[in-house]
């Protein structure tokens, strides 16, 4: 949902409220996080100011507004919406029941016809439409517009009006490095590339059985994670030993555990608990007092080491929080190739507009790929979005699987002339695919031999090496999920996105949040095997509904002055449902190359 800062300012000015630019930016972020439009957010804000009798509005007041007022109000609204959603699902079940009756009737009619002599007029013929005329040419010779005709799966589909009349086509929304004067075109399949999927220890390559996990198995995975990260923190900070959580001590103690909440609500600074590890604390829990900590950033599921006073064994007064330690960078070797710089194009779904099921954005993307011929194209799902109105209402005449196959065939055949390597990443919102995390790659058994060399179907999440440059890829809206749960206190100017990205790398996981969002179905045994970071990626790509950004971090080997910094030379991108182009030099792998701004990035 797009939120305009200008409209938000105008709504507040109606009530005589003047806010600083930083406050407006924070309000825009809250609008996206809590699904509010400009008018609704202004109304909630006025109600809060009236009830608390506040005349001026600061960032501190805004934090109180979020925790004490907005989250409670929105939770009630969502509870009411869940009831309405149940009614809509009931209507969808009726549609399915009618469809089943029609299919049974057709089967009976087919059985009856098998005992009679078929008439000449009963022979089936291929249905043709103006968009898909019947020709003698093979399917592969047709254009993408003919391959992906919406009339084949949605006769009522109409062209998207807003998309076709948009005025910002091709607009550059942000850039990094020497984006100006760079030739944004690759060599397609002309230059040799080394493409490898990394795992921890092996990547996920196929489906697995899920919905069979037991609670002790989940507990074991979480315990292993605490022990592994605790061991790294102990070695890095030279900690002698961890103390048991429930044992009183008059001297400062150092405790290892996982952050949790004392209730089912949202985490706040008064509801933080520390759940100890199995070896030292037998999994016991203790409330944490954060009043002595000047700076902290916490979320449920975070593995931390805390130092503090535990005189009673019933509450820890934390005085120090140890920062997590990221994994080392991957060091390129001879197998990673020795090519010149290469161009990567990234796009994320959905590839339809909200008001139409036609794939006009996808067809435009194919045109751009054929024009610019990038060396690698990374395409994130969803390809057929489960949240699309026509999908939710079951208005498609073809099965979800058939529509996806038609979409995938259009991408592969439509870009064949470019020679670009295709990396296809699934999404939990792909309506036809397995809704479990980590998510297996798509299956496509009918790939031609010439396409098998350039098409790579990978899992969600995935760690990919392109000529030794490591890309961390995830289509899950991790920024949105963790942004809604994280609490922080900081005397500096660090922003929420930088902190979240820091957590992802220091927790060494593509989804460190526990418990996860309600719509996330995580299989924890496979999560432990396939959703951990094998190395710190050079580039971390996380599409999100939140605003796009590019963030760069520092370490001792890199001296880049950048306003937004977060960690260890890694480069993080949120494409925010837009396309971006990137050019990567040979020297970028292993966390180097950012120093001279030799990486060029452009988001459109």
From Swiss-Prot:
Modified residues (Phosphoserine): 143, 149, 154, 156
Pfam families: DNA_pol_E_B, DPOA2_OB, Pol_alpha_B_N
Places the protein is found: Nucleus
A molecular function (GO) term: DNA binding
BP term (GO), one: DNA replication initiation
Phosphothreonine PTM positions: 129, 132
Regions of compositional bias (Low complexity) in chain numbering: 143-160
Family matches, as InterPro entries: DNA_pol_a/d/e_bsu, DNA_pol_alpha_B_N_sf, DNA_pol_alpha_bsu, DPOA2_OB, Pol_alpha_B_N
Region Disordered: start-end pairs: 109-171
Compositionally biased tracts (Polar residues): 113-141
Keyword check for Nucleus: yes
Record PTM text: Phosphorylated in a cell cycle-dependent manner, in G2/M phase.
Presence of the UniProt keyword Nucleus in the record: yes
An example Gene Ontology CC term for this record: alpha DNA polymerase:primase complex
Keywords attached to this entry: DNA replication, Nucleus, Phosphoprotein
Family from the record: Belongs to the DNA polymerase alpha subunit B family.
Protein name: DNA polymerase alpha subunit B
Organism of provenance: Bos taurus
């Amino acid at each position: 949902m797009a939120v305009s800062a200008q409209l938000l300012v105008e709504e507040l000015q109606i009530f005589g409220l003047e806010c600083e630019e930083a406050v407006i930016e924070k309000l825009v972020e809250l609008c996206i996080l809590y699904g509010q439009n400009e008018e609704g957010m202004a109304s909630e804000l006025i109600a809060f100011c009236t009830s608390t009798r506040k005349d001026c509005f600061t960032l501190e007041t805004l934090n109180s507004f979020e925790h004490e007022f907005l989250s409670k109000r929105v939770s009630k609204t969502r509870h009411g919406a869940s009831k309405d959603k149940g009614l809509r699902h009931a209507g969808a079940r009726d549609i399915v029941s009618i469809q089943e009756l029609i299919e049974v009737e057709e089967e009976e009619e087919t059985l009856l016809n098998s005992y009679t002599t078929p008439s000449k007029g009963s022979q089936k013929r291929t249905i043709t439409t103006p968009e898909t005329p019947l020709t003698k040419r093979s399917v592969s010779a047709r254009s993408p517009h003919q391959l992906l005709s919406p009339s084949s799966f949605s006769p009522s589909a109409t062209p998207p009006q807003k998309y076709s009349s948009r005025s910002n086509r091709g607009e550059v929304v942000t850039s990094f490095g020497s984006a100006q004067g760079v030739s944004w075109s690759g060599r397609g399949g002309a230059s040799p590339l080394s493409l490898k999927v990394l795992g921890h220890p092996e990547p996920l390559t196929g489906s697995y059985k899920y919905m069979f996990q037991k609670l002790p198995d989940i507990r074991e995975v979480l315990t292993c994670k605490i022990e592994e990260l605790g061991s790294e923190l102990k070695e890095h900070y030279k900690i002698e030993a961890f103390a048991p959580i429930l044992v009183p001590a008059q001297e400062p103690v150092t405790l290892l555990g996982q952050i949790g909440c004392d209730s089912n609500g949202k985490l706040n600074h008064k509801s933080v608990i520390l759940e100890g590890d199995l070896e030292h604390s037998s999994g016991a829990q203790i409330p944490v007092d954060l009043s002595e900590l000047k700076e902290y950033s916490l979320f449920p599921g975070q593995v931390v080491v805390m130092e503090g006073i535990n005189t009673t064994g019933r509450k820890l007064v934390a005085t120090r929080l140890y920062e997590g330690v990221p994994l080392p960078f991957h060091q390129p070797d001879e197998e990673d190739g020795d090519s010149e710089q290469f161009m990567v194009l990234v796009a994320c779904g959905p590839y339809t507009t909200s008001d139409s099921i036609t794939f006009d954005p996808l067809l435009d993307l194919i045109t751009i790929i054929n024009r610019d011929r990038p060396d690698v194209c990374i395409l994130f799902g969803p390809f057929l979005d489960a949240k699309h109105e026509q999908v939710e209402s079951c208005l498609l005449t073809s099965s979800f699987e058939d529509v996806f196959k038609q979409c995938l065939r259009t991408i592969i055949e439509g870009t064949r002339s470019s020679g670009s390597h295709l990396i296809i990443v699934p999404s939990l919102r792909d309506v036809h695919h397995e809704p479990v995390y980590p998510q297996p790659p798509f299956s496509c058994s009918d790939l031609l031999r010439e396409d098998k060399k350039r098409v790579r179907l990978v899992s969600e999440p995935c760690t990919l090496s392109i000529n030794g440059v490591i890309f961390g890829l995830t289509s899950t809206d991790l920024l949105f999920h963790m942004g809604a749960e994280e609490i922080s206190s900081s005397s500096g100017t660090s922003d929420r996105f930088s902190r979240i990205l820091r957590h992802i790398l220091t927790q060494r996981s593509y989804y460190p949040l526990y418990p996860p969002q309600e719509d996330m179905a995580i299989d924890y045994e496979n999560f432990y095997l396939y959703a951990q970071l094998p190395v710190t990626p050079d580039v971390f790509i996380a599409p999100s509904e939140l605003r796009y950004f590019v963030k760069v971090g520092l370490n001792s080997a890199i001296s880049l002055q950048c306003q937004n910094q977060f960690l260890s030379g890694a480069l993080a991108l949120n494409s925010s449902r837009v396309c971006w182009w990137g050019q990567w030099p040979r020297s970028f792998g292993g966390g180097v190359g950012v120093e001279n701004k030799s990486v060029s990035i452009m988001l459109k």
